[in-house]
Amino acid sequence: TFIANSDPFRSSPFDPYRGDQGIAPWQLLIDDVRAKGGLTFWNHVETQSGVREMGPIKVHTAPHPEVLDESRGYTGFAVLYGDTVTVTEPGGLWDRVLSDYCRGYREHPAWGIATAHYHRENEAGEQLGNFQTGFFVEKLTRKDVLEALRTGRTYAYRGTYPKFARLDEFSVSSADGDRRAISGEQIALKGNPVIRIRISGDAESRAAVRVRLIRSGELVKVFEGPLPLAVRYEDEYFRPGERAFYRIDMQEHGTLVSNPIFVDYRMNLDVKQATGG
């Protein structure tokens, strides 16, 4: 043990003998992966299953949502998985992280994905396909999929496979529709933003769903109706000099969580990619 943890054999400046070293070891990993062009995602940060007994072994990984605030430069985190998630609630921890990005306190936003603690079919009632991450890509190539993951052009969905809901459109545009941004992008506007939402489901579904529109951590509007659902909503919100973000979530026919769209009332630009991943 001494030899393996001694220089020059150690690959990390941290060891298990100096107490809790906080976020530093994880930040080192995040920084190293980013420097090499990789992506990093925090997984299951609120799960309760990390504290349990496995025969003679006691596992203790307590819920740790605070890492989303304490760490910097990670690509994103799991907004949906097989446990209760609260950090995505309006005004919650995710919105605080995104607001920090809007205010210039963070260089990168944090994107959401779906993950599954999946081991085998029907264990705990789960099936492969219950947790899905949807991608907005022009071509289904490895390069385009990874770029969408890096830049937040994705959404997360939890359902009961093969039933599903699909986010066909979530966009913010100018009133005349000439400029438009989708998840992971930023749009500069000189007037009220127009939000468009289209959600469809599997062929047999006419389920009624409930969609929440969230602006910079504040619940703005709730839309309800059967699938397929189409919404056009002009938000009477124009704040020169401010930077805001919009995101949505959906309940009832499963759960769907979008990634944010940023609106900049400060810059004379049209649409650009937010600084992601």
Regions of interest found by a model, annotated:
Residues 13-126, 203-220, 244, 248-250:
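Domain-core and long-helix interface of multi-subunit machines
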Residues 101-111, 116-277:
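C-terminal functional module detector
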